[in-house]
From Swiss-Prot:
GO terms for molecular function: serine-type endopeptidase activity. Gene3D superfamilies: alpha/beta hydrolase (3.40.50.1820), Prolyl oligopeptidase, N-terminal domain (2.130.10.120). The keyword Hydrolase applies. This is Uncharacterized peptidase y4sO. Belongs to the peptidase S9A family. Its EC number is 3.4.21.-. SUPFAM superfamilies: alpha/beta-Hydrolases, Peptidase/esterase 'gauge' domain. GO terms for biological process: proteolysis. InterPro entries: AB_hydrolase_fold (IPR029058), Pept_S9A_N (IPR023302), Peptidase_S9_cat (IPR001375), Peptidase_S9A (IPR002470), Serine_Peptidase_S9A (IPR051543). It comes from the Bacteria. The active site is at S554, H676.
């Protein structure tokens, strides 16, 4: 049973008055910003204690859910290794150890060799996250980066595989890593100390230990990515637009520079000048460059041009801009360009031969799914790899009801074969059905909802809806990873709860225009699209009126809090993980990480019109004492470098202060270890997921085991 007698904590109030654009606001909890203040830590611990005490009733159900999740997490086999040079690289789990280690074996056969074991890192038993793992072409050197705190500031190391010694360490926030073709020169991006922006490219000669900055970006709204072309022949520096996340892998750039990979000490050459509104992604293919560009429309087109003359007048069109079809990614093989495009939310892969022939096309059977080309080490800054001198395409497909399948498709014979199929213990896909439901928004636009439920589920049942809807990022159905996390969600489905992802405007699932339709002075469309989706499911008897729970992470957490402020009557409960709960205060402080990026999405509160619009929906400033909000679970991370812990903490304190009874159904927990992406490994991952699922089931009146 719930503990109703325990009083929720409330921190002290220190009234600070701010006058901006003739609007007077009172902030009573700004003092929570100081992470070193003992009173701040005491308040966070008090909230953690309250959360533990008042949710102790879910302990037995949580234990059952943990067992279910851990059973499904025990997959058979391992995904295919990726090849770099003379070696295949792969991960192997180790009995009794928390983390999988990296190994390799020669392509021609031979014994396996340990490359990197994160279990040997001091502190990795508490938290560990891989940044990148990049072998040199000849396999002599391995560059890798990792985070042991959770603040996503990755330490770089280089290991000499001939003797196993680490020959370079750089603790200064490394990003993307890439080797030149000489097998001794490593390029990497380095982050500014005062904000989350990789603004320098460093060249390191690992044999002499000499490093130097070779490129620096001064515009704080832009950042740098260094990468190697799919052919391996060129290196690129992308000056990326930090506010755009419309491609999961290939970020839009305002400017691109190139360098032959065999001549790493040469001067970098700019291949397309910076221009307002101009976005590009470059690849190398034979004697040409390929550009994915937005010069004729937001859905992008593909052009080819000579390497020595990249002026727009020399461009030849390969794939035109098309209404309703977004050109998401390009991947090069020796004789083919592979285009990953999406019509609506349906992905497809299209091969374009060097002779101009188009085809074959690969269209997944499932309408709403995730397709990934190539193989990757899986770290935050790892690049997907695909062999170049081949005629077969390797890709991965997954969905709500399809665990990861790795497929090789021969482009000459148009035949496919499965390389590896992930098997999930106890999962019977035929018991579940995935579909796409279209909801009509308040302005008549149709908003897709990808949804999954058991086939034997009746009408008017409970539903958990996930949402993000910012920066053009895509939230697509998958089986593993956020937001799908089906190894945990199946426990909800088996108890009659459906799960859906609402592809609201502001996200990038339907292309660039879909994102831009809900930015700045149209941002409220993100929230009203979510509301329309919930109402649609009720109207069509897919969801019961009192059975809708909404959840979101980060910017998506801000979305669900804003929707709950607009329509508290519509939602049974709300989960907001590391939520962007106070947009105005974040953007007023340009010393904060990502504050400048947020202005492109939400507007700039330093401007009167933008401020007034933000003021109309910012969750923190729209809490009122006369409204009862749905039961809400909020979490934060003390070392989060994206959404700083005090944003949700201030929201919780403000909401408690507005309620006569301090809102006992508001639960707030701060992780003292880890960062924005939560617990990194081990039992804690299943435990966090199980708690959330148990809390949802309790709020839906399904506390039984």
């Amino acid at each position: 049973m719930e503990n109703k007698s325990l009083q929720p904590p409330l921190p002290r109030s220190e009234r600070r008055i701010r006058v901006l654009h003739n609007d007077v606001t009172i902030d009573s909890y700004g003092w929570l910003r100081d992470r070193e203040d003992p009173d701040v830590l005491a308040y966070l611990e008090a909230e953690n204690h309250y959360a533990d005490e008042v949710t102790s009733y879910v302990a037995e159900l949580k234990a059952d859910l943990i067992a279910e999740i851990e059973k499904r997490d025990s997959c058979d086999g391992a995904p295919p290794p990726f090849q770099v040079g003379f070696f295949f690289y792969f991960q192997k789990s180790q009995s009794g150890l928390l983390h999988s280690a990296w190994w390799r074996r020669p392509v021609t056969g031979g014994p396996e060799e340990l490359v990197f074991d994160p279990n040997t890192l001091p502190g990795a038993e508490v938290f560990y996250s891989l940044g990148a793992l990049e072998p040199s072409d000849d396999g002599r050197y391995i560059a890798f980066s990792f985070d042991l705190i959770g603040n996503e500031r990755y330490e770089l190391r280089v290991r000499d595989m001939t003797n196993g010694r680490e020959i370079w360490r750089d603790p200064s926030r490394a990003g993307r890593l890439v080797w030149a073709a000489d097998n001794r020169t490593l390029f990497f991006t380095r982050e500014r100390a005062d904000r989350r922006q990789h603004d320098r490219v460093v060249r390191l000669d690992v044999e002499t230990g000499r490093s130097e900055v070779v490129f620096e970006e001064v515009n704080e709204r832009l950042a740098l990515v260094v990468r190697r072309s799919g052919s391996g022949a060129y290196l690129f520096i992308d000056v990326i637009i930090t506010s755009d996340m419309s491609s999961r892998i290939q970020r839009a750039a305002a400017e691109v520079w190139c360098l032959p990979a065999e001549r790493p000490t040469d001067m970098w050459r700019r291949i397309l000048a910076r221009e307002l509104g101009h976005e590009i992604y470059a690849e190398h293919w034979g004697n040409e460059f390929l550009f994915r560009v937005n010069d004729t429309g937001p859905n992008l087109r593909l052009v080819r041009t000579a390497i020595d003359d990249t002026s727009p007048s020399r461009w030849q069109e390969v794939v035109p801009h098309r209404a309703g079809i977004t050109l998401e990614e390009i991947h090069v093989l020796e004789e083919h360009v592979i285009v990953l495009e999406r019509e609506g939310i349906q992905p497809r892969l299209v091969a374009h031969h060097r002779n101009g022939r188009v085809g074959p096309s690969i269209v997944p059977v499932e309408h709403s799914c995730t397709v990934t080309v190539g193989l990757s080490a899986g770290g935050s800054y790892s690049c997907a790899r695909h062999p170049y001198r081949v005629s077969a395409l390797t890709y991965k497909i997954c969905s709500f009801v399809t665990p990861d399948i790795f497929i090789q498709h021969d482009l000459l014979t148009d035949k496919s074969k499965v390389l590896y199929r992930t098997l999930v213990s106890g999962f019977e896909p035929e018991l579940y059905e995935a579909r796409v439901v279209m909801a009509k928004a308040e302005d008549g636009v149709e908003v897709p909802i990808s949804i999954v439920a058991r086939r034997d589920r009746g009408e008017d049942g409970p539903v958990l809806l996930n949402v993000y809807g910012c920066y053009g990022a895509q939230s697509l159905p998958a089986f593993f990873g956020w937001p799908s996390s089906m190894t945990a969600r199946l426990s909800l489905l088996d108890r009659g709860v459906a799960f859906g992802i609402v592809h609201v405007r502001g996200g990038g699932e339907l292309g660039r225009a879909w994102h831009e339709a809900a930015t700045r002075d149209q941002k409220r469309l993100t929230h009203t699209d979510l509301i329309a989706a919930a109402e649609c499911l009720v109207e069509h008897r897919f969801a019961s009126r009192d059975g809708i729970v909404i959840e979101g992470r980060s910017a998506g957490g801000g979305t669900v809090l804003a929707a709950a402020v607009l329509r508290p009557d519509l939602f049974r409960a709300v989960l907001a993980e590391v939520p962007l709960a106070d947009i105005i205060d974040t953007e007023l402080d340009f010393t904060l990480p990502y504050a400048l990026r947020e202005t492109a999405e939400y507007g700039d509160p330093h401007l009167a019109n933008d401020y007034q619009y933000l003021r109309s929906y910012d969750p923190y400033y729209n809490l009122t004492p006369d409204r009862r909000y749905p039961p809400t679970y909020i979490d934060a991370a003390l070392h989060d470098s994206q959404v700083l812990y005090y944003q949700p903490a201030r929201y919780v304190a403000q909401r408690r202060s507005k309620a006569v009874d301090r809102d006992p159904d508001l639960i707030f927990r701060t992780r003292m270890i880890g960062g924005h992406m939560g617990v990194s490994h081990g039992p804690g991952v299943a435990e966090e997921a199980a708690f959330r699922m148990a809390w949802i089931l309790h709020r839906l009146g399904q506390s039984g085991r």
